[in-house]
Amino acid sequence: MAENQTTAAPETAAEPTAGRVTRIQGSVIDVEFPVGHLPDIYNALTVELANTGVHEEGETTKKITLEVEQHLGDSTVRTVALKPTDGLVRGATVYDTGGPISVPVGDVTKGHVFDVSGNILNKKADETVKVTERWPIHRNPPAFDQLESKTQMFETGIKVIDLLTPYVQGGKIGLFGGAGVGKTVLIQEMIQRVAQNHGGVSVFAGVGERTREGNDLIGEMDEAGVLEKTALVFGQMDEQPGTRLRVPLTALTMAEYFRDVQNQDVLLFIDNIFRFTQAGSEVSTLLGRMPSAVGYQPNLADEMGALQERITSTRGHSITSLQAIYVPADDYTDPAPATTFAHLDATTELSRDIASKGIYPAVDPLSSTSRILDPRYVGQAHYDCANRVKAILQRNKELQDIIALIGIDELGEEDKTTVNRARKIEQFLGQNFYVAEKFTGRPGSYVPADETIEAFTRICDGVYDDVPEQAFSGIGGIDDLEKKWHDMQKEYGA
């Protein structure tokens, strides 16, 4: 709510405090202010430059936003620029806005793409956007007595997720994986499913990823009709590190308004949280801080905690966050993914080995976890089914070395049955996505959690032992399985 704000940016500044640039080193700018008028940490400063080359249409000046990061003494602050500093000179006049960067909030954000400062990037020439309220991006997390204590499952309709790594309503979910295993596709699919099946509001933060992917995402969401229910904030890999560091806060501020003022459940997507950490490392180096382990910033845990603590459920309303996490060189001991682990309620690990088998989503069923995979939250039937599936897959994994040496025919009957069921389970954990329809030609499917549990219980019980492995590939629920098996019998004359 409004009382949760740290420092509200004033609507009008009659006499903004002016300072001057004393030092420029890349995107780090030192600014001197009059004695007694030093801006607070995280205040936004602006400097306007005339005749600096290319401007936005209709603009005669280039405005640069600076964010105060350090007080150096002698009435001087050290700032980080959020835009390129080409053309900036010593002695240029800098104005203190009197508060942190503030961004538009509310219904005006839906269907629009914003930069870190809240400027609309996809506004049509004839479109008039009236911003009635702005919130600062630096805010305190909800007080402890405002937090929601109830825990419940968030149904996605994706079999492998609902069964083995159920998501928490108002929780934080990490999508782990190396390059090219499907993190962004899974996020796009979740945006589609939230809009279609839950009618919720989504906020997307594109942090340090490819601009092409951002354009593709906007186009696909527009085609699917979900763009009007989504606010998007982008700070892609060609942006300044200061911008990439603050984009998640801009998106989170918009999500907090929907939760706290409009009393809505919100899904916040961050792609990619590793780039947030990476940007923090770059800013830390620019500011001259001593690096910590593997060259990361010494305040890595503090920066991550400040972001993650704001992503939570208040009484009756929630922000559920899905965060894609790039794992450098597939090394899970790297400080960036390791620091993120501590804040997550569920982890979905995407495996290159499973992707190489052509099974998508390439979720590793044995490595992915969820804190609510517990009878108290999901029920005994769900818990027992998930454990049976994991036990079969684990036993199959243990038998692979033996099979490679002597072949599957030399196994005992019980192990043969386990391997055959495991292969069917692996195929059945795959699923067609709505966002991939135009690439695969196969329609996407939504499988309710109850149907998922029933189907996998039947497989574990041996009901489908006579059904070939191929029948389990590329389908949705039980009805799809039985229809495909019936069609295969007709085709092969069985």
UniProtKB/Swiss-Prot annotation:
Binding site for ATP: G177, G178, A179, G180, V181, G182, K183, T184
Topology of the protein relative to the lipid bilayer: Peripheral membrane protein
Signal peptide boundaries: none
Keywords for the protein's UniProt record, in alphabetical order: ATP synthesis, ATP-binding, Cell membrane, CF(1), Hydrogen ion transport, Ion transport, Membrane, Nucleotide-binding, Translocase, Transport
InterPro entries the UniProt entry points to: AAA+_ATPase, ATP-synt_VA_C, ATP_synth_F1_bsu, ATPase_alpha/beta_chains, ATPase_F1/V1/A1_a/bsu_N, ATPase_F1/V1/A1_a/bsu_N_sf, ATPase_F1/V1/A1_a/bsu_nucl-bd, ATPase_F1/V1_b/a_C
EC number: 7.1.2.2
Class of the enzyme per the UniProt entry, highest EC level: translocase
Reaction catalysis annotation: ATP + H2O + 4 H(+)(in) = ADP + phosphate + 5 H(+)(out)
Disulfide bonds: none
Keyword Signal: no
MF terms (GO), sorted A to Z: ATP binding; ATP hydrolysis activity; proton-transporting ATP synthase activity, rotational mechanism
Source organism, top-level taxon: Bacteria
GO cellular component terms, A-Z: plasma membrane; proton-transporting ATP synthase complex
Compartment annotation: Cell membrane
Subunit structure: F-type ATPases have 2 components, CF(1) - the catalytic core - and CF(0) - the membrane proton channel. CF(1) has five subunits: alpha(3), beta(3), gamma(1), delta(1), epsilon(1). CF(0) has three main subunits: a(1), b(2) and c(9-12). The alpha and beta chains form an alternating ring which encloses part of the gamma chain. CF(1) is attached to CF(0) by a central stalk formed by the gamma and epsilon chains, while a peripheral stalk is formed by the delta and b chains.
Family, per entry: Belongs to the ATPase alpha/beta chains family.
Function text: Produces ATP from ADP in the presence of a proton gradient across the membrane. The catalytic sites are hosted primarily by the beta subunits.
Full protein name: ATP synthase subunit beta
Lineage, highest ranks first: Bacteria, Bacillati, Actinomycetota, Actinomycetes, Bifidobacteriales
